[in-house]
A protein has these predicted regions:
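Glycine-rich, aromatic-flanked loop segments that form ligand/cofactor-binding clefts
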Residues: 256-261, 287-335, 368-372
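Aromatic-lined carbohydrate-recognition surfaces of secreted/lumenal glycan-active proteins
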Residues: 233, 305-315, 370, 397-436, ...
């Protein structure tokens, strides 16, 4: 055997010895490490769970260190949960903090431990999309929590999924409280006592049962509402001649237009929403959506604030397409009341239809949606007395509750989309009672961005030889003073923006209403403190009448 071969064998043996020594040293080191250093426990991903917005955390001795936000993702020691330990270790940097086992959830869906919440205001639940309104809930009603839809950075629930004996659905966090006492309390007990004392004088509902909790309002970014709106009204035909009306308004004080989207049977454009809900309305359209959009845009391009008007619970087309939605006799035959058919204000599908339509139309260029005919029919008293009317009242609500709850639902959706909401009411509504048709000024003004009374002088009854339509200043001023008194009775009143009579009186002696009479109406409103503006009501949108009176509208 050569010397080279012997050297190779000797070198290989040395390598083996070295490797064996290293293995032995490693094993010895591991034994020593295990003896003096505890094993690193296995951790799992989880979420902080709590009935409140945070969960307390403790040190090893049980002293509270602070809190963790509900819903925060953490790493926790799995064996602490599995073994039923009194505290669960949660990784905190290079060490641990400790929480109660109940404050750890394996899934995000288990982060909210609240079992019951309470409705802050009377309203309707909605489905997961927030689009379809569901069952009514009453102020202070207990709602069983069945889930939630998101948490904010502070651990607050964004929306609660709840159920009650009437149904199930979603409700936003701002509309619930965690105790029945908090939910049932009135925001302003002194103001509430005023409403409660009024009761139910005319069958429209008890003022005590309406909601007076403030509605969050305010400027919408990118959508500026004038402090005083000075508007001409354009029906569905008139908007097709937008250029002509803009020439009339040019250089005057007019800064806005009210444009019909739908006015009873008069449909301004072929709406896809109408095609879905009411094909006969779609078929009756006076113009295409494209043309309608272009004409609305002309008003916007001229710097005008544009309001879209929708009649809600007066709809002959919907009544024809869906008679099951309509106020009827006890056999289900729709009743024609005051020469109209009335989809019930209790019907949630009607709510959704009109709000879907509002959102579709608003996207065509409107700043605001104005809801008209937000009421039950006048003229139903004889049917009520005879017990021969079916209002389709599923949840036992009053008329005024249905009107207010529709507005709460619609305003939430429209505000979320960046549009203002206004509501038209009878001039009578400025009085200190709930009207027979379900309108109560403080409850409506509390929800909308602007409330629009219709104190047309020729709509008031004569008192002997005194004819209110012969005294436009006095008639409108009296209304304005009453309206401002009602405004003081709610915590979040909308602007008072009033319809003024812009047509010749329809009652003897058929007074002419020209620039002087309209100037009296405008001055009366301002003198009474109704500073939100005015809108000219002329059903025909008579351009010659507008030319005649325009000097009074600056």
């Amino acid at each position: 055997m050569s010397t080279k071969t012997e050297k190779k064998r000797g070198g290989g043996a040395a390598v083996v010895v070295i490797v064996l020594c290293l293995i032995a040293l490693g094993a010895l080191g591991y034994v020593i490490w295990r003896q003096f250093c505890p094993a690193v426990p296995d951790t799992a991903a989880g979420y902080v769970a709590s009935a409140g917005t945070t969960a307390p955390v403790y040190d090893e001795k049980g002293e509270q260190l602070g809190s963790l936000v509900r819903g925060a993702e953490v790493q926790y020691v799995a064996e602490d949960v599995e073994s039923g330990a009194e505290r669960v270790r949660v990784v905190n940097g290079e060490g641990y903090v400790y929480v109660a086992p109940a404050n750890i959830a394996a899934d995000y869906s288990g982060a909210v431990l609240t079992e019951t919440v309470y409705a802050l205001r009377g309203m309707s639940l909605v489905d997961e999309t927030g689009v379809t309104p569901g069952c009514a809930v009453e102020k202070g009603m207990a709602l069983t929590v069945t889930g939630f839809d998101g948490l904010d950075e502070a651990g607050q629930v964004l929306r609660w999924r709840v159920s009650c004996d009437r149904g199930e659905g979603y409700i936003s966090n701002e509309n619930v409280r965690l105790t029945q006492e908090e939910a049932a309390a009135q925001y302003d007990a002194e103001a509430y006592a005023i409403h409660a004392a009024r009761g139910d004088a005319w069958g429209g509902g008890d003022a005590a049962d309406l909601d007076y909790y403030p509605t969050e309002k305010g400027p919408i970014p990118g959508n500026d509402m004038p402090d005083e709106v000075r508007a001409l009204y354009l029906n569905g035909s008139a908007i097709q001649y937008a250029d002509s009306y803009l020439r009339v308004a040019a250089g005057t004080g007019i800064n806005a237009f009210v444009v019909d989207i739908v006015d009873g049977t008069a449909v301004s454009y072929a709406s896809p929403v109408m095609q879905q809900y009411s094909p006969s309305a779609y078929a009756a359209a006076q113009d295409t959506m494209e043309n309608f959009r272009a004409n609305v845009q002309k008003l916007r391009d001229a710097g005008c604030y544009v309001i879209g008007r929708i009649t809600v619970f007066n709809d002959a087309h919907l009544a024809a397409d869906h008679p099951e939605y309509v106020i009827s006799d006890l056999d289900g035959t729709p009743l024609k009341i005051s020469s109209m058919y009335w989809p019930s204000a209790y019907n949630r599908t009607v709510w959704q239809y009109k709000t879907d339509l509002a959102l579709e139309a608003a996207a065509l260029g409107f700043n605001e949606i104005q809801f008209d005919y937000i009421r039950f029919p006048d003229g139903a008293y004889k049917y009520e007395q005879a017990g021969t009317i079916d209002y389709k009242n599923t949840y036992g609500e009053s008329k005024a509750q249905a009107v207010q709850r529709f507005l709460i639902y619609a305003a939430q959706r429209l505000h979320d989309a960046g549009y203002y909401v206004s509501g038209d009411v009878f001039g009578e509504c400025a009085n200190a009672y709930v009207t027979a048709c379900g309108q109560y000024w403080p409850a409506i003004s509390s929800v909308v961005d602007a409330i629009s009374g219709m104190p047309y002088p020729d709509h008031y009854s004569a008192q002997g030889d005194y004819k209110p339509w012969e005294h436009p200043y006095t008639t409108v001023h009296n209304f304005g003073e009453s309206a401002m008194a009602r405004q003081s009775e709610t915590a979040s009143p909308g602007a008072v923006r009033t319809w003024i009579q812009c047509y010749n009186a329809i009652r003897e002696p058929y007074n002419h209403y020209g620039a002087a009479e309209l100037a009296d109406e405008v001055r009366a409103l301002r003198d009474a403190g109704c500073t939100g503006g005015f809108m000219t009501w002329n059903g025909a949108s008579d351009i010659d009448k507008y030319r005649e009176v325009i000097s009074a509208l600056s």
